[in-house]
Amino acid sequence: MKIAIGCDHIVTDEKMAVSDFLKSKGYEVIDCGTYDHTRTHYPIFGKRVGEAVANGLADLGVCICGTGVGITNAVNKVPGIRSALVRDMTTALYAKEELNANVIGFGGKITGELLMCDIIEAFIKADYKETEENKKLIAKIAHLESHNANQEDPDFFTEFLDKWDRGDYHD
């Protein structure tokens, strides 16, 4: 099984710990970045994880930022992605079993590495429990998706990053 994983600069160490754990369990990890602590932007890496899963390069995805809120929102903008921000086993299992989530997100500064690893392993092993009710819920969620052709442009974030480099945006 292939797992795409991505993060922002705040939780690079946590992502590497999760990646190492997944590899130790025999999973193939597709590391979508970031790879160091240089200031960056979580939407870039949420999009990369989402695209890897949506395009079939990965079976599931894991996104991590400081709180998990930003990167989970970003990955959910990729058509075909159903991601849940999780901090406990119950939420992760519900997301997979009832809503067929294909990505989970974490706040790496909120949820510890060991707990993240336990939750991810349970998420991977859980099966979607297809029922008529679940299928209808997922169809309703999918109906909300909007497709933005600009997202497919490899330079989607270039203008934003150029403005950042010029100092137009600040934390």
From Swiss-Prot:
InterPro entries xref list: LacB, RpiB_LacA_LacB, RpiB_LacA_LacB_sf
Keywords: Isomerase, Lactose metabolism
Reaction equation(s) it catalyzes: aldehydo-D-galactose 6-phosphate = keto-D-tagatose 6-phosphate
One BP annotation, GO: D-allose catabolic process
Enzyme class: isomerase
One family name in Pfam for this protein: LacAB_rpiB
Stretches assigned to coiled coil: none
A GO term, aspect molecular function: ribose-5-phosphate isomerase activity
Superkingdom of origin organism: Bacteria
UniProt-listed Enzyme Commission number(s): 5.3.1.26
Pathway: Carbohydrate metabolism; D-galactose 6-phosphate degradation; D-tagatose 6-phosphate from D-galactose 6-phosphate: step 1/1
HAMAP family xrefs: LacB
PANTHER family per the UniProt record, alphabetical: DNA DAMAGE-REPAIR_TOLERATION PROTEIN DRT102, RIBOSE-5-PHOSPHATE ISOMERASE B
UniProt similarity note: Belongs to the LacAB/RpiB family.
Quaternary structure and interacting proteins, as annotated: Heteromultimeric protein consisting of LacA and LacB.
UniProt xrefs under NCBIfam families: lacB (TIGR01119), PRK05571.1 (NF004051), PRK08622.1 (NF006381), PRK12615.1 (NF009258), rpiB_lacA_lacB (TIGR00689)
Protein's recorded name: Galactose-6-phosphate isomerase subunit LacB
